[in-house]
Amino acid sequence: ISSSYVGNQVRTLFREKSAAGKKPSEIAKEVNEVLFNELSEFRFYCTAQIVQIFFDTDTILFLSAGHPEAIINRDSCRDIKLTGNQSPVIGLFNDENYREEIIRLSTGDSLLLYTDGIIEEHSSDNQEMYGVNRLIDSLNGTENFSSSEILHHALGNLYEFNGYRPQNDDITLICIKKT
């Protein structure tokens, strides 16, 4: 079975479960059961970050399964921190428990989601990895930036670190900012 076929099936599962109004933990648990029960012999698994935004309450339900913790940039107190919740990858083990986190965003706050390809990127001399601390440091002073400006600033910092070399891994960066 090709991974692209499985990827399409997993995407469809996520969409179906999301459209049914389920919470991120329920979505992850149900997709995990399907992957484990139907594809465990092939050892297929996936990582995911599931985000549900509730504009009426300024809250986000967030689940990270096998991805690095997201970064919350609090504008009001100039505080940048990691979310405190990580769940296992989806599809490898039966009967996993997944937990979402409730994040409340105030005006000016942002949530940064990223893949491990960013923090595992190597310096131009291959002596060190970028790491989560450098990513967090790249967000200092971006409180008044738009989400697009935050992304450009963070990626510019990363590319400067790696000497603008071609990437070896996927690099995905998403910024959700409350305006």
PLM region descriptions:
Residues 106-109, 165-179:
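Activation on terminal intrinsically disordered regulatory regions flanking enzyme cores
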Residues 67, 115-117, 170:
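DG-centered beta-turn motif at the end of beta-strands
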Residues 1-21, 80-81, 105-165:
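Active-site-proximal, acidic helix/loop segment immediately C-terminal to a metal-coordinating Asp/Glu
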Residues 63, 112-113, 173-174:
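Sensory beta-sandwich core in regulatory modules of signaling proteins
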Residues 43-45, 91-97, 156:
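Short gly/ser/thr-rich secondary-structure transition/capping motifs
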Residues 1-84, 98, 162-168, 176:
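Catalytic core of PPM/PP2C metal-dependent serine/threonine phosphatase domains
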